[in-house]
């Protein structure tokens, strides 16, 4: 069943040089975790704001849970939840107050809201600070409070804009566990992130957006397979110049070393040449991070060549 569909969705802000979203077509199936990747300003947050009825599109349409986000906005808001990127806790409320009040405002009975709030605080390890003034919390704790407010609702679809930003690796994984649990219960989650490991670990499907356009979409595996001609990553530490490495694949410079994305044959040839030169290299499979840099870099080069 379809949870979200956008058709030629376009958003142009006043005085902007170009569209924030440029004719974006997306389909998101119900009961999955769908991730949006892109650089800052790529259009991810704009998409989430339109899909969650917070922003009007310039043109095109979006339907969420079968409802039009413009025509049926009021009805839709009762069935979705969102954690916006700019969300903040409120003085002098406690973490418990935040979660409890949010659930009550959505119409949840008092006793059930109390139980749900406590569950969220326990699962995200906020119990010890549950009755503390939110202004005294660390940035990571505040972020977990914001996430707890969304995931404990009965919303059928939850939008999360960079939900784990500012969290340490352990607490990021705790949020991942909760999102996976929500998916297993049949809920749909649409999130944005800059963490490629997060996208790879959580996503059923993902999309890469660059300058308002979709430049890649599919499962994490299929998106990586989109660069099958460069399936191996070779880091070269010495004894080669960038131009010499160019014949093996695409070359970039990272932290003082060259990184070559190549195919298996190219990696084999480069390995033999490195052995002959006594060069230091390391090889590993291409990651989603490599693919993101590769795809976005290619898209931007293409746009530059057109201007």
Question: Where do the model's predicted regions map?
Answer:
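A short, flexible loop at the N-terminus of ABC-type nucleotide-binding domains that lies
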Residues: 1-6, 11-23, 72-73
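Conserved ABC ATPase signature
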Residues: 92, 133-140
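Conserved ABC ATPase "signature" region
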Residues: 100, 104, 111-129
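A short, proline-enriched helix->beta-strand linker immediately N-terminal to the Walker B motif
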Residues: 152-156
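Catalytic Walker B motif of ABC-type/P-loop ATPase nucleotide-binding domains
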Residues: 158-162
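ABC transporter nucleotide-binding domain
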Residues: 176-263
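Short, charged/small-residue-rich alpha-helical element at the C-terminal edge
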Residues: 229-302, 307
């Amino acid at each position: 069943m379809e949870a979200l569909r956008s058709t030629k969705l376009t958003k142009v802000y006043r005085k902007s040089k170009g569209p924030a979203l440029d004719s974006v077509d997306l389909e998101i199936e119900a009961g999955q975790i769908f991730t949006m990747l892109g650089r800052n300003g790529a259009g991810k947050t704009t998409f989430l704001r339109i899909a969650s009825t917070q922003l009007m599109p310039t043109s095109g349409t979006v339907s969420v849970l079968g409802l039009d986000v413009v025509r049926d906005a009021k009805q839709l808001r009762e069935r979705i939840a969102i954690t916006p990127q700019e969300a903040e806790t409120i003085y002098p409320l406690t973490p418990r107050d935040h979660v409890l009040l949010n659930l009550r405002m959505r119409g949840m009975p008092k006793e059930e809201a109390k139980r749900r709030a406590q569950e969220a605080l326990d699962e995200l390890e906020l119990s010890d600070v549950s009755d503390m003034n939110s202004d005294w919390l660390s940035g990571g704790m505040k972020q977990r409070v914001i996430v707890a407010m969304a995931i404990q609702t009965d919303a059928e679809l939850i939008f999360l804009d960079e939900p784990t930003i500012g969290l340490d690796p352990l607490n990021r994984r705790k949020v991942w566990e909760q999102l996976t649990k929500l998916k297993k219960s049949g809920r749909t989650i649409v999130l944005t992130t800059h963490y490629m490991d997060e996208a790879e670990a959580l996503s059923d499907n993902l999309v890469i957006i660059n300058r308002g356009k979709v430049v890649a979409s599919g499962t994490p595996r299929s998106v990586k397979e989109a660069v099958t001609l460069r399936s191996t990553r070779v880091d070269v530490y010495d004894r080669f110049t960038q131009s010499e490495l160019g014949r093996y694949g695409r070359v970039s410079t990272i932290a003082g070393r060259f990184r070559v994305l190549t195919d298996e044959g190219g990696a084999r040839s480069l390995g033999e040449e490195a052995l002959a030169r006594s060069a230091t290299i390391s090889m590993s499979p291409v990651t989603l991070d490599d693919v993101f840099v590769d795809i976005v870099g290619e898209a931007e080069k293409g746009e530059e060549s057109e201007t």
